[in-house]
Amino acid sequence: MARVFPFRGIMFNESLKNQLGDFLCPPFDVVSEDLKEELYDLSEYNVIRLENGKIYKSDNEKDNKYTRASNLFDSWLKNKILIQRNQPTFFILEESFEVMGKYKKRRSIISNVDLYDYEEKVVLPHEKTRKKQKQDRFQLMKTARANFSRIMSVIEDKDSNLINFLIKETSSDPEFEGSIPNMHEFKIWIIDDKDKISFLTNLFELENIFIADGHHRYETALEYKKIIEEKSSRRMMNLVSMNDEGLLLLGYHRAFSGLNDEKLNLLINKLKEFFIFSDVKWEESFFEANYSDEDKIIMVNNNSSTSLSLKENIKSTYEALHTVIESVLSPDEVINHIRYEHDSEEMKRKLDSNELQLCFFMNALSKNYFIDMVSRGKLLPPKSTLFYPKLPTGLVIQYLNDI
């Protein structure tokens, strides 16, 4: 099964640890231009400058966001803004956050993981990727020779060996801690004890790895290994136990805008082949459609709210809705008329202001369903999973010159 390794991770200088939260950013694919501007203003050392820097009209082959990231990375290393650890270690990350008024903690191991082709059935994907995003990540890897963000992956951990280890280790004082503006608090521990390292490497040899967030980055690493450098055979990941109570799998809602009445009516009629319709009050169903494992959808327009319950022979709300959408809309119509959103309050606000015409509030897939489907090699419909919260970028960096 999976082979994991400690590594000489790069972190911000310990003298800057009180400012560490100002240096971090979300994953590259969820950073809007407005947020990017805010992160640039937050700190001259915010890692967005490395992970997904600004693009200028004057950019050319020698001066672009990739070359600027590479040069800045080298500069931060030279000036000891970033420091590479002397010895290979594992890192433990504990994230604390609030969801729907409840306080949660998620714990994970940061490690290097051997790269496996999907056909080897060791690292398992659950979604298709897009070429444009992989080209972007490839160019950054090639130019900067580093990975600034970690892939989030999960393991079944049936005997709870990983989560029990993490709970025990996080009972001591951390090496680093901080908070990320508008996100969450974090703590980091260093694992350099030989016996503990051996325990972890042996533990993962019995596990499959399920990619939770980071398919584009994983496939980019495979491509990099194939084209650029065969010895670059590992990728930095956060590995989380499925038994961690702080591992939240939330729903990704669907919103429609700009569809004509004919398409809308066709969509709703087609849904009746898969779902049983019943009227509900929005106020009663609002929270139900955000953090529940129940297999139903709440459909809302400006005039009514409807609960859609799966018929007996149908297994998944996401698959059923995806089947209906594909049968009614062309690929271009899907791109032009559907938005995906995990914030149900924000989506309802847009619906009330007539920015949207029809919304489907989705419940989360259960963890067991996710494991079962992915283990059998099934790819899930687009935007079926949201492992919340997304990992902050910049806590630990993987240097490709030091595999």
Regions found by a protein language model. Give the residues of each.
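Surface-exposed, charge/polar-rich loops and edge strands
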Residues: 1-403
